[in-house]
């Protein structure tokens, strides 16, 4: 870039800066901020993906695609049917790797924020975390009908936080789904089907 050229820089926290190149010094450019504006590229609702740990390296692809599609945060969850069992050391390394993938995917997709990849948690911890959200969806392969789910999705409003639980390849245990339904029986819009 030449002196006097304009560029837009994102800070990863939802802000864009329109800048002009003023000069170059050694190995850096000196920029002047002309305008600061909110990045409008994010979804109107914050989507939290509670993802059951899949086999092999499938989580890398899941993180990449979820971030590209607009997920606000990915929370890896150790469910009963998860084949992958991670000790603390392996889990830490995996989360670091997944976070790097999230950063790359966010840049590639032109996201205004860098979505976080949470620490690997238990299913019970994930349910506790989801209690703070406005809407929780748990797609379940043995559920009957989709009308209630469609209605809940249609009623999601801008600014609401939405948790989506996705099981591992084997899906959720029936008792895991029942446990979630017991926690989320309230007047707020929740779906346990």
Feature annotation, model-predicted:
Residues 1-38:
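N-terminal positively charged helical leader segments and presequences
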Residues 9, 165-168:
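Thr-Gly-centered strand-to-loop micro-motif
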Residues 34, 40-137:
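RNA substrate-binding interface of SAM-dependent RNA methyltransferases
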Residues 138-159, 163-166:
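Active-site/ligand-binding-proximal alpha/beta "capping" segment
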Residues 172-177:
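Short, glycine/polar-rich helix-capping loops at beta-to-alpha or helix-loop-helix junctions
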Residues 184-193:
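Single conserved hydrophobic/aromatic residue that forms the stacking wall/gate
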């Amino acid at each position: 870039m030449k002196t006097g050229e304009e560029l837009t820089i994102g800070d990863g926290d939802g802000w864009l800066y329109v800048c002009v190149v003023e000069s170059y010094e050694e190995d850096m450019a000196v920029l002047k901020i002309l305008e600061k504006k909110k990045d409008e590229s994010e979804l109107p609702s914050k989507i939290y993906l509670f993802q059951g740990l899949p086999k092999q390296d499938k989580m890398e692809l899941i993180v990449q695609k979820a971030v590209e599609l607009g997920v606000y945060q990915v929370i890896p969850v150790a469910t009963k049917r998860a084949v992958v069992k991670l000790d603390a050391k392996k889990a830490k390394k995996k989360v670091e790797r997944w976070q790097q993938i999230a950063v790359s995917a966010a840049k590639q997709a032109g996201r205004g924020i860098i979505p976080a990849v949470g620490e690997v948690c238990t299913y019970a911890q994930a349910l506790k975390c989801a209690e703070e959200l406005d809407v929780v969806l748990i797609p379940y392969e043995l559920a009957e009908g989709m009308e209630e789910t469609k209605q809940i999705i249609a009623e999601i409003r801008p600014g609401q936080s939405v948790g989506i639980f996705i099981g591992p390849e084997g899906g959720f245990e029936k008792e895991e789904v029942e446990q979630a339904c017991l926690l989320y029986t309230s007047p707020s819009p929740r779906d346990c089907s």
